[in-house]
Amino acid sequence: VLGGTAVLAAALPAAAAACAGGAETHPFAAFGDQASYVIAPGGTFESGAPGWTLTGAGIVAGNESFAATGTHSLAIGPGGRAVSPPVCVGAEYPTFRFFARQLAGDSDDTLTASLRWVDLLGITVESPAGAVTPSGSWEPSPIMRLGNSLPLWLPGATLDVQLVFTSSGGGSWAIDDAYIDPYSR
């Protein structure tokens, strides 16, 4: 039993120094969310989508006007998917948010967000984080769980996680300014 315990402990996410952060801002303050956030890797879409994997999605002109200046956003077509580059996440990164708007589709179409990581056995896992309901104007997403919904059992443990955005149904969407909460309130 001790040998099995040692193997399991070795397979747990490694305890590591806190993930490197970025410049903190309060992009959702106008909506009652006073939390500090850092931009996700490539999450502004102003320089394209470096490191993102896009299927049925691409950079377009136009963006939200609440959190940042810029002129671009990421459009995700019907059935399309956008996957962020890996981002280091620990328990101190409890949530994430972004801005979204529906470009076309029905009122029952949704934009879903999920988290992708590799588990202890080397299997890629994708778990739901939340969904955005249709709105023809730019709006902040709901606060979606991140670090507090991952298997981070050891103090200081981290995982490389990808944010996955999928257009469900026949709708198309635009997203902009994806932010991660570093829990430094």
Model-derived regions: residue spans:
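C-terminal region of N-terminal signal peptides and the immediate post-cleavage residues
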Residues: 6-23
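Extracellular glycan-recognition surfaces and repeat-rich motifs
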Residues: 18, 23, 29-32, 38-73
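Extracellular carbohydrate recognition and processing domains
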Residues: 31, 120-158, 166-170
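Solvent-exposed strand-to-loop "edge" motifs in beta-rich extracellular domains
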Residues: 46-50, 86-91, 97-106, 116, ...
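Short beta-strands within extracellular/lumenal beta-sheet-rich domains
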Residues: 70-95
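Short, conserved beta-strand segments of beta-strand-rich sandwich/propeller modules, principally
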Residues: 95, 158-162
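Short, surface-exposed beta-strand/strand-loop-strand elements in extracellular ectodomains
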Residues: 111-118
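Extracellular carbohydrate recognition
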Residues: 166-185
